[in-house]
């Protein structure tokens, strides 16, 4: 598992830095303003990206008791998806990190080192 360092988006922009997704999954430190961009450069294979909910039952005064499940989204060949932001009370593990895993959509097998799935974590500074 690799830890991805979030990149700050500023008025001057940001140079994207897509990293190859790690077969065992990836993680990033989450403050609640981060989102992820995942790009599939494969010509035909699709992948399913899962963000693991660490707290599956929580309470919000306005809505009452809520149940949260993992978020899974497919990224088809040649496409990009964006996910987030991630509420820390739901998504952060004991180390304050969000956990992300990847499988092939066709057979749910774990990705291998030869896949073409890329990820970056971005955030806007909140003032």
Language model feature labels by segment:
Residues 2-127:
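Surface-exposed, low-hydrophobicity beta-strand/loop segments enriched in small/polar/acidic residues
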